[in-house]
Amino acid sequence: MHSYDYWLIIAFFAVVLVPAPFLGRFYYKVMEGQRTWLTPVLGPVERACYRLSGVDEQQEQSWQKYMLALLAFNLAGFLLLFAILLFQDYLPLNPQKLPGQEWTLAFNTAVSFMTNTNWQSYSGEASLSYLSQMAGLTVQNFVSAATGLAVLVALCRGIGRKSTKTLGNFWVDMTRATLYGLLPLCLVLALFLVWQGVPQTFAHYVDAVTMQGVDQVIPLGPAASQIAIKQLGTNGGGFFGVNSAHPFEDPTAWANLFELAAIILIPVALVFTFGHYVKDLRQSRAILGCMLALFLIGGATSLWAEYQPNPTLNNPAVEQAAPLEGKEARFGTTGTVLWSVTTTAASNGSVNGMQDSLNPLSGMVALVNMMVGEVIFGGVGAGMYGMLLNVLIAVFLAGLMIGRTPEYLGKKLQAKEVQLLVVTLLVMPVGVLVLGAIAASLPGPAGAISNPGPHGFSQLLYAYTSASANNGSAFGGFSANTPFHNLMLGLGMLIGRFGYILPVLALAGSLAMKKTAPIGQNSFPTHGPLFVTLLTVTILLVGGLTFLPTLALGPIAEHLSMGF
């Protein structure tokens, strides 16, 4: 590693951790309707939205009504995007006259962007019109991120409130999350990216002749606006097929740094938002400590693995520093590894190199980051409510060990809450192991694997893990654009999204109705090093014990077979 690599890592953490506490407080004030510095500008717009849609911002909802509103909104978004993708050849802003998507691919794409997964079985510049990218995908990037933020806020209210049946108003939370939480940051980042060289235009693709005399089509489009929200909203779906490895998506070192930091900026800020809701920022610091510990363990492992020479090229005539296959030379090994670990620690899925080219241990780190439920920062809202589920599981285990009724911040965890927690523990195994086993056992779907042996199994395992974790990244050698995989991966995305959201809202409703008992000396503290250790071990054990056999068949077997 060179000095540049160390400065990149330091700058990355600085850009994320310095503004995060202030942004977290801002989100708390926004979501609770308190006045902020943006209120004079956006307040009239917010009130106009309520008047036009007939929403009473003072009318709160029970968890059941909140859930129904969320499901109805997401269904409407799916149907609209599905229609746009099917009939894009009849719609405007299609200068390349691209045809509509085949229906299983359109289903997969619509589910992918509605669930904040952004799995892409297509190449954007070769398959989608400007309208589909802008009015279809970009809109869903905003509202899917806002949905996750709204669910987190509902859970925070459930934990922080007492003896109430309401969790807020879904329509109000969605409006505030989009208007205040996402749009201003995206505007700033989009303008910055345009300055750095990312295109934002409706012009036709450019026909050019290369220095070798070969004709080439250079794709353009309204890319900067979509890239801003794909990073900040932990969406990850690229405007271009190779995502942020494309020079039009990630043209400079500065663009690379801020796009990378944008992946986890809001998820880290929302950790502090939770602390404001429960009036105890010590809880936020403990949770963030756990997230950082898991992130640093994975990052260090991945960096070490990627700087090892490839033993299959163990030849004195071959000089090796670090394997560069699948990496952009302008970003280098450290820049690619840092992005790989960050994009899978958050449910982002964007890449600036090829995940399929990672060494086996680095690929395993990416898999484990997703298998633990995308709780190491995770998606906007989704990562934090996933982490809070693990916090409650850790509290329950601590209660069993010391022989007391488990409680968290004065709320007792009883049979109903534990049952809901168990339901969430089954989401990833069902999505990854059940759906993945079906795909692996059938000769047709298994034909999507491009490599024999352990790496081929890793390709399939990665695809179904990514879909179920709502991540969206992929091992590029996996040919996913088949009717079977389009439908099965779409099902995995739905399970991974709503298999968490529905129990989380039910849990929030149950906790909101409980009284808060005073926290005494005999209560198990959830803000110290002991609890951080317990929480970290809980996350690793739940994920590790469930998926260790599949990891042994994939990346671990590949690592050993290569002779590392």
From Swiss-Prot:
UniProt KW Transferase keyword: no
Mode of membrane association: Multi-pass membrane protein
Pfam families tied to this protein: KdpA
Subcellular location: Cell inner membrane
Any one GO cellular component localisation term in the record: plasma membrane
Keywords annotated in UniProt: Cell inner membrane, Cell membrane, Ion transport, Membrane, Potassium, Potassium transport, Transmembrane, Transmembrane helix, Transport
Molecular function terms, GO-annotated: P-type potassium transmembrane transporter activity; potassium ion binding
Transmembrane segments: 4-24, 67-87, 135-155, 179-199, 254-274, 286-306, 382-402, 420-440, 487-507, 528-548
Main location: membrane
Protein family according to the UniProt entry: Belongs to the KdpA family.
Oligomeric and partner information: The system is composed of three essential subunits: KdpA, KdpB and KdpC.
Task of the protein: Part of the high-affinity ATP-driven potassium transport (or Kdp) system, which catalyzes the hydrolysis of ATP coupled with the electrogenic transport of potassium into the cytoplasm. This subunit binds the periplasmic potassium ions and delivers the ions to the membrane domain of KdpB through an intramembrane tunnel.
NCBIfam families for this protein: kdpA
PANTHER family per UniProt: POTASSIUM-TRANSPORTING ATPASE A CHAIN, POTASSIUM-TRANSPORTING ATPASE POTASSIUM-BINDING SUBUNIT
Protein name: Potassium-transporting ATPase potassium-binding subunit
Organism of derivation: Pseudomonas fluorescens (strain SBW25)
